[in-house]
Amino acid sequence: TGQPACVASTIRICLHYGNLDVLEDGYGINMLPLATFALETYGDDPCECFAAKGGEDSGNSQQMLERRMHKAITVMQLKLENRLIRENPEYGMENRRLLEKIDYQNGTVTIGEKTYALRDKSFPTIDLAHPDELTEKEAEVLDKLIFAFRNSEKLQAHVDFLLKKGSLYRVYNGNLLYHGCMPMNEDGTLKEVQVDGKKYKGKALYDILEHNVRRAFVSRDPKKREQGRNTLWYLWTAPNSPLYGRDKMTTFERYFLAEKETWTEVKNAYYRLIEKEETADR
């Protein structure tokens, strides 16, 4: 569907693990607009926090280019996610509006009651008054990347296959099969999650989320299509998403903070309670 934050996240992950060829060669997605922008914007930045994970990074020209592309798309992703959270308070992710918690002059960020020094303090595309606003060039690059994703025949064929054959859960041969977790409270009761202004739990939660995902592809109402696209991002990262099931996704912390205790992602109570027979009986 070309959901902007999902597109940015996909590219970032490929760069993080040194798998950009999956997009370029596997799906025919042109990374030149991002590469050009990264060189123009971060050409003098060593981007040390953005070296690919695994393998040896000797700092050759190709690796330096990918580091800069990595930082460029990461900053775009953080902006897009910050805006999504701000515009959708029912996601319950206000504490993840981290771009608004950064002191850009001193190079620190306040998370909870603690203030941490940033490992990378250079943010040339951040508007201090509107930190989650894309620059004109960032928006232009993102539009080109989204166009490439939407027009990749192989990618669209794979997504069509998932929509035709896949589902969030299925009853098969007397067994209930489902992705991820069933969001629970600490006492083992099913957690109520707000979606589109109403509260859902258990099977009803899976049903409404799958309904919204499919709306992203088939609805003729632009607003509903947009809501559906945003649901795809919600499923990927939100604490109340059955597919994620952790209190937060610490992408920002892992790039910018040295304190590893900030990297912790606490799993939903489901993962502790599912081993108990009384939980299954509910």
Cite the ranges covered by each PLM segment.
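Feature recognizes metal-dependent phosphohydrolase scaffolds
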Residues: 1-282
